[in-house]
UniProtKB/Swiss-Prot annotation:
Keywords, sorted A to Z: Cytoplasm, Methyltransferase, rRNA processing, S-adenosyl-L-methionine, Transferase
Subcellular location: Cytoplasm
Binding residue positions for S-adenosyl-L-methionine: G79, F84, A130, E131, R150
Record-stated family: Belongs to the methyltransferase superfamily. RNA methyltransferase RsmG family.
Top EC class of this enzyme: transferase
Provenance organism: Latilactobacillus sakei subsp. sakei (strain 23K) (Lactobacillus sakei subsp. sakei)
GO molecular function: rRNA (guanine-N7-)-methyltransferase activity
Protein name: Ribosomal RNA small subunit methyltransferase G
């Protein structure tokens, strides 16, 4: 996907990209590739692949969720790595207030420099583990209108990382590259236990490559019990499952 095609494809979805925003994406691409030589940010470095599989993929939620386009949502991106999906969404929709959480300080340093160079405001960067970020008595617990995650972890693990940070009435949006038929069913217990309720699983394909993608949207319908998230490492080693599933 060339930058020109990126702009044209978004326009088909009634999203206009200004020259300033296009320049910001170009700076993003250049800094991503340059920094990646020293810090492991991405395996994808070819320009057209970055525009498709990082930039377009990251803004996909805005094609389906009007609130991201029109409201000043307070969103949190957990395990954002090189800033995906939150920073591409922030570039297109500057009214969003973004908090990015990542456990690797080198990635946070990259994002600090990038955010400054892009001239973005209302972006907070937090160096922390997902399991610690939203524990009881931490200032970020149940504070966000929306929490996003673009990760390969199973949904029952992502739910424990992300739902505790979502305020009641907010949403958790998982961007999944692929999803087994059973993954959501296996995550149902975790989602309910953590105060969530599955709203929708939107399946779509990336343009040009037809790579499958899923947006899993979970409403936060009640407060997360105090004991979640569990201590660092436990959600991955012992994902939440109903007793009969174990």
């Amino acid at each position: 996907m060339t930058p020109k095609t990126f702009v044209a494809t978004l326009k088909e979805h009634q999203i206009d990209v200004s020259q300033k925003q296009l320049d910001q994406f170009e700076i993003y691409f250049e800094r991503l590739v340059a920094t990646n030589q020293n810090v492991n940010l991405t395996a994808i470095t070819e320009k057209e692949a970055v525009y498709l599989k990082h930039f377009f993929d990251s803004v996909a939620p805005t094609l389906y969720l009007e609130s991201l386009r029109t409201m000043p949502l307070n969103i949190c991106d957990i395990g954002a790595g090189a800033g995906f999906p939150s920073l591409p969404m922030k570039i297109l929709f500057p009214q969003l207030k973004v908090t990015i959480v990542d456990s690797l300080n080198k990635r946070i340093h990259f994002l600090e420099e990038l955010v400054a160079e892009l001239g973005l405001t209302d972006v907070t960067l937090v160096h922390d583990r997902a399991e610690l970020f939203s524990q009881v008595k931490r200032p970020y617990r149940e504070q966000f209108d929306m929490v996003t995650a673009r990760a390969v972890a199973p949904m029952n693990v992502l739910a424990e990382f992300c739902l505790p940070a979502v305020k009641v009435g907010g949403q958790f949006v998982a961007l999944k590259a692929s999803q087994s038929d059973t993954e959501l069913a296996e995550a149902a217990f975790a989602i309910e236990t953590l105060g969530g309720q599955l709203k929708e699983d939107i399946a779509f394909n990336l343009p040009e490559t037809n790579d499958p993608r899923h947006l899993v949207i979970i409403d936060k319908v009640q407060s997360t019990p105090d004991k979640y998230p569990r201590r660092a490492g436990v959600p991955v080693k012992k994902p939440l499952m109903a007793k009969e599933e174990k």
